[in-house]
């Protein structure tokens, strides 16, 4: 058999040291999350500033086996950090070589459904395989800080810093991974199809904008050619909508699962896009390589990545433009968000979907157009994905190292909080709208590394509100008019929550625990900047901001950002258990501790911080 280029690269990657490094990382994140989420309860032996964790298991002969590792419980949300290799102890000690063996042995002691365990093991093994290839191919010709925003979207290859199956991409074969994985920067052509209006719809009240985006994205000449093709099939172009499709989705899912629709001309293949596109970190969002200022295109992908199926739910596609319009109006009427912080909303301004109400194809054919960040960048401004702020070069150097050295850690950190974090909190406190502001949903706009402002994105599934806490309830969209799923849904299913605590949990979980907290780790581990000091500065800047808005005092207190503990999502547990009452666990809040320390510091110096 003749080996192709991809096959040769894969063999070299697996034989390299990168395979061992990636396997160690996946196992480390796996053990950290299992302990942190309380899925396993190892014995703990305190040893100076470290903890020796002893994890019990049973081998296939039901003989006792122990896994050992050293780590710490962090100030930042009580997160667990494993600092040593993880070794298997049974007739001697040996570093773990197999994710499958570790989980099989540990879960003979802890009960879990075998099919769920097998599925999770597969995700982890695929993550090791696919990240090994990415790390082996990693390009270090330029430092990260020398790269543009678009380049960073492709070069930030490390994936989720907490989730252990951060690069599973279940559905992609190895050639698919090379062709469509964002790390490999292969340009692709979108597939355009015509979809009959009996099953195809545009976003709610979005027809005019949809027509405009088609002319812009396809071009009038090509649009006419597409209409002629529909005519030649004996159909009326006025009865069809045009939808861009990811080429992998077309080849591997649409053709086989929509064969009946293709046969009866419910779907008509039109051709490839003129422009080239390239995947961003989220995989299903594509940037226009030919014309970078043109919109990003978010399309359905029937792959499982970071434990989530990357399709687009029809109801969320339907409401996407309305949500962006709502948020845009809110920001435009808030002088702080509009003029002072100059927050950028990358609006999801148009959308289209095809839905036959069949379970097997649900969410598999849809598109959302989102504004490009390049549309907003001013002179001398550049941008970096927020998760890039806690990423590292291959040698372990933080990519923000040069910026910290140039501006000083405290000065740079305070600016970051003022320009990027405070606007998200202000939106919750002033307006009652919480965004899922994790690392991929935020973009820092900077000038030579100095934080300037924040761009926020991906609103169609990442927003929550508690109706009694909305500043202007009458401005909130009526989602029940937009899609039948909303009309048939209940509280907490979508955007509307039944308690104000949900807004608090969204901010503490998405913004701080799994996003800003990672930056606290980088500063602590690489620069010996204490986590306590980090969170004290965060609290100082939050309170400095809200002192300027005394009318928000009661609303700020209602959010209870300084609660001693809160309930965080269990990302790993949800891969192992389905029939459980709750997939959250109680964790300590570093903002509470930091505020207490700030009060003590103020009292000691004769201040009145506690009365602020």
From Swiss-Prot:
It catalyses: N(8)-citryl-spermidine + spermidine + ATP = N(8),N'(8)-citryl-bis(spermidine) + AMP + diphosphate + H(+); N(1)-(3,4-dihydroxybenzoyl)-N(8)-citryl-spermidine + spermidine + ATP = N(1)-(3,4-dihydroxybenzoyl)-N(8),N'(8)-citryl-bis(spermidine) + AMP + diphosphate + H(+). Disruption phenotype: The deletion mutant cannot produce petrobactin on iron-depleted medium. In vitro analysis show that mutants grow to a very limited extent as vegetative cells in iron-depleted medium but are not able to outgrow from spores under the same culture conditions. It comes from the Bacteria. Coiled coil: none annotated. ATP binds at residues 282-284, 298, 310, 390, 461. One of its GO terms (molecular function) is ATP binding. GO terms for biological process: siderophore biosynthetic process. Its EC number is 6.3.2.-. Changing residue 313 to M: Increases acceptance of polyamines lacking a secondary amine. Pathway: Siderophore biosynthesis; petrobactin biosynthesis. Homodimer. Involved in the biosynthesis of petrobactin, a catecholate siderophore that functions in both iron acquisition and virulence. Catalyzes the ATP-dependent condensation of spermidine with N(8)-citryl-spermidine or N(1)-(3,4-dihydroxbenzoyl)-N(8)-citryl-spermidine, two intermediates in petrobactin biosynthesis pathway. Belongs to the IucA/IucC family. This is Citryl-spermidine/3,4-dihydroxybenzoyl-citryl-spermidine:spermidine ligase. It comes from Bacillus anthracis. The lineage of its organism: Bacteria, Bacillati, Bacillota, Bacilli, Bacillales. The gene is asbB.
């Amino acid at each position: 058999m003749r080996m192709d280029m991809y096959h040769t690269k894969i063999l070299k990657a697996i034989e390299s040291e990168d395979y061992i490094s990636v396997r160690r990382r996946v196992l480390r994140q796996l053990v950290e999350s299992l302990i942190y989420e309380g899925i396993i309860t190892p014995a703990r032996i305190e040893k100076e500033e470290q903890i020796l964790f002893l994890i019990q298991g049973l081998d296939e002969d039901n003989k006792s086996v122990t896994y050992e590792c050293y780590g710490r419980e962090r100030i930042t949300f009580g997160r667990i950090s494993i600092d040593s290799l993880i070794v298997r102890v049974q007739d001697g000690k040996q570093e773990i070589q197999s994710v499958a063996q570790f989980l099989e042995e540990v879960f003979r002691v802890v009960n879990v459904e075998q099919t769920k365990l097998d599925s999770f093991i597969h995700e982890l093994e695929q993550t090791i395989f696919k990240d090994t290839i990415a790390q082996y191919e990693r390009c270090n010709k330029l430092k990260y800080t020398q790269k543009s925003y678009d380049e960073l979207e492709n070069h930030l290859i490390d994936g989720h810093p907490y989730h252990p199956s951060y690069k599973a991409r279940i559905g992609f074969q190895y050639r698919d991974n090379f062709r469509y994985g964002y790390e490999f920067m292969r340009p692709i052509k979108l597939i355009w199809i015509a979809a009959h209006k009996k099953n195809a719809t545009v976003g709610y009240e979005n027809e005019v904008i949809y027509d405009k985006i088609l002319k812009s994205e396809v071009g009038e000449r090509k649009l006419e050619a597409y209409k002629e093709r529909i005519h030649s099939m004996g159909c009326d172009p006025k009865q069809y909508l045009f939808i861009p499709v990811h080429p992998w989705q077309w080849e591997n899912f649409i053709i086989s699962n929509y064969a009946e629709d293709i046969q009866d001309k419910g779907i008509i293949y039109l051709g490839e896009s003129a422009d080239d596109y390239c995947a961003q970190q989220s995989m299903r969002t594509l940037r226009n390589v030919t014309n970078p200022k043109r919109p990003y295109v978010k399309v359905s992908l029937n792959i499982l990545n970071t434990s989530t199926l990357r399709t687009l739910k029809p109801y969320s596609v339907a409401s996407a433009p309305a949500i962006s319009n709502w948020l845009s109006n809110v920001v435009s009427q808030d002088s702080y968000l509009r003029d002072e912080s100059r927050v950028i909303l990358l609006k999801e301004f148009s959308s289209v979907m095809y839905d036959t109400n069949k379970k097997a194809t649900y969410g598999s054919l849809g598109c959302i157009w989102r504004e490009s960040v390049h549309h907003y960048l001013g002179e001398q401004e550049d941008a970096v994905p927020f998760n890039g702020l806690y990423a590292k070069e291959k040698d372990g150097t933080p990519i923000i190292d040069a910026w910290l050295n140039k501006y000083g850690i405290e000065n740079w950190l305070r600016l970051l909080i003022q320009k990027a974090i405070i606007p998200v909190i202000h939106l919750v406190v002033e307006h009652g709208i919480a965004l899922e502001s994790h690392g991929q949903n935020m973009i820092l706009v900077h000038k030579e590394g100095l934080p300037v402002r924040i761009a926020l994105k991906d609103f169609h599934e990442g927003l929550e509100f508690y109706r009694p806490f909305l500043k202007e309830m009458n401005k909130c969209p009526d989602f029940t008019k937009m899609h039948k799923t909303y009309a048939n849904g209940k509280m907490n299913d979508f955007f509307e929550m039944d308690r104000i605590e949900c807004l608090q949990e969204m901010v503490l979980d998405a913004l701080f625990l799994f996003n800003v907290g990672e930056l606290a780790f980088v500063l602590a581990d690489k620069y010996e900047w204490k986590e306590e000091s980090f969170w004290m500065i965060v609290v100082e800047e939050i309170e400095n901001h809200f002192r300027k808005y005394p009318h928000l005092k009661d609303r700020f207190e209602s959010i209870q950002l300084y609660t001693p503990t809160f309930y965080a999502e269990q990302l790993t547990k949800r891969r192992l258990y389905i029939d459980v009452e709750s997939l959250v666990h109680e964790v300590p809040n570093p903002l509470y501790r930091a505020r207490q320390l700030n009060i003590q510091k103020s009292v000691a110096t004769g201040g009145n911080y506690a009365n602020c």
